[in-house]
């Protein structure tokens, strides 16, 4: 695995949703690096990719959640080493108990399949059905890493570009949350 700067020169065999991500970033003039790899379905599978992206890059868990009624949807970005406890998040956002949303909602709102969840999928949520939630620790590293809506590539760009260019262009104002570290949980 090695870094490439920007979008792939040859887009043969790449999905339209992946190419739309590169076009979106290029239009925003976001400088980014890309690494292509085997499908990464879990955080464990991402460990080798994490090493390529570097210690200065926030690699997050991206959880697609909903309320019990399946009327409110959330995309939570959180550090990979933090455990997720629904009660900690529910209290902060004033929602009843949250659970993982069904894959069909992920495809409907984000044009993403399980294992490929990415904040960049919000560019496909034209109805603004998904609320972006970001754990404050995600924004502490100088760089941010995510999939381009497909789990066979990973991207790295500056956290400053993420907060100053990408999030505003996604038009999904985030709610910042603080999830406890394992040692802080009772």
Where are these predicted regions, by residue range?
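Extended, low-hydrophobicity, polar/charged segments
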Residues: 1-186
């Amino acid at each position: 695995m090695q870094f490439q700067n920007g979008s792939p020169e040859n887009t043969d065999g790449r999905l339209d949703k992946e190419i739309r991500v590169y076009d979106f970033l290029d239009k925003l003039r976001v400088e980014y690096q890309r690494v292509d790899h085997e499908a990464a379905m879990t955080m464990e599978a991402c460990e080798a990719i994490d090493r390529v992206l570097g210690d200065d890059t926030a690699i997050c868990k991206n959880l697609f959640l909903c309320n019990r009624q399946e009327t409110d949807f959330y995309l939570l970005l959180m550090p990979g080493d933090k455990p997720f406890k629904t009660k900690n998040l529910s209290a902060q956002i004033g929602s009843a108990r949250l659970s993982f949303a069904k894959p069909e909602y992920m495809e409907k709102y984000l044009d993403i399949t399980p294992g490929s969840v990415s904040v960049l999928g919000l560019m496909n949520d034209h109805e603004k059905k998904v609320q972006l939630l970001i754990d404050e620790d995600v924004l502490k590293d100088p760089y941010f890493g995510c999939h381009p809506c497909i789990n066979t590539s990973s991207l790295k760009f500056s956290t400053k570009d993420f907060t100053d260019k990408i999030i505003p262009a996604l038009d999904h104002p985030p709610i910042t949350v603080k999830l406890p570290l394992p040692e802080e949980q009772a």
